[in-house]
Amino acid sequence: MALCGLISLGTLAWAEPGSFSVLMAGAKADSVSDDTAAIQKSLDDAAASGGRVQLPPGRYLVKGSLRIPPGVTLQGVMESPVWSEPLKGSVILATGGRGQEDGPALFELGHSSAVRGLTVWYPEQQTTNIFPYAWTFHLQGHDNTVENITLINSYNGVRIGPESNVRHRIRSVYGCVLRRGILVDGCSDIGRIENVQFHCHWWSAPEVGGTWKPVHEFMWKNCEAFIFGRTDWEYVNNTFVFPVNIGYRFIQTKAGAANGQFSGIGADEAQVCVKVEAIQPMGLLISNGQFVCMHGDTRIPVLVENTCQGSVRLVNCSFWGPNRQCVVSHSKSFVSLSDCYLSTTFGGKNTTRLPLVEADAGKLQVRGCSFGTDEPSVALRKGLQHAIVTENNGVRGAQIINEIGDQAVIANNEPEQKPR
């Protein structure tokens, strides 16, 4: 028994079939020695038959990029994301990729590879002089996983594609991302993003050189948290960002655009929560969303641009805060809101007199919604092809501006109540 106590964690990990320890390959985990080569050697050793490379507790300085081979998992000790103070567990101190946004990522993942259970911190990044860095994770190929990860101050978080890829799994990733959180492109078979939260307070602790105010300001001015180019049937569940420039952005790339389902998503202290520039015709299914805008001149939680050619459907979503409006659509396609709560309330006062919902193109449905503040509820502007507005109520009834005449079906709404 006494001898067992002398066996190092690294030796135990080495002895376990299919498991390799970076300590046995020469990693120091002392935050001073460059451990890039030792970690990569362990990953390459595991590649022959597949296996798990263990990162015991410690601070591993990585000055370069790490390639995770097919069939290999880089495994830290953390079973869940962690807070930044005290900074414990398996911690990667990354210094490579500074000034090279398109350079190699800290972790390059291919087929059937994974990174789990660790924290990433960029110790040379400064809150008062934020500098671009390469992506922390870059995924391509089939069936790769990033799970139970804490990002202290990543400039760019997780990039999937643009190379061909399918069935990515991004789970339980928490932390601070400064410019971009997760970017998906080139995915042709259902990717999954689950239980993700981005927030400035992960880089507010003195232990990691953080300060709330400059990080908070940089994020709401610059951060795009979730960006979707080409992805087929993307499943996104339980995600959140605070603060942010654009929470969820849908774009056209060389590979195409997105469709998918988005449930339990949220964005707070945003300029725009959801911005739809391009999607596939079958479009977006958004449910149980919570959207608050506070910063900038736009302050529209859901903005659908005239370049959008696909369907946007929102069900059981809530809009509040000092929004200028809640939903504005210029789309030539379909936009639908059902069972939503919409308001511009902040501190008990409504902040604008613009319509809560406004559309000037395509076709619109607003059904079973409640309007929590007393500006116009829905504006059907010239250029809108058709609208159905039914079974809505509000603090002053459903106030509807109709500029399209009999192209609108308006029925069974609470009558408008004139101010007293």
Locate the predicted segments by residue.
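Acidic, glycine- and Ser/Thr-rich low-complexity intrinsically disordered tracts
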Residues: 334, 339-340, 344-349, 363, ...
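Extracellular beta-strand-rich solenoid/capping regions of secreted or surface-exposed proteins
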Residues: 40-45, 60-75, 81-117, 121-143, ...
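Detector for repetitive beta-architecture
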Residues: 19, 50-52, 57-59, 65, ...
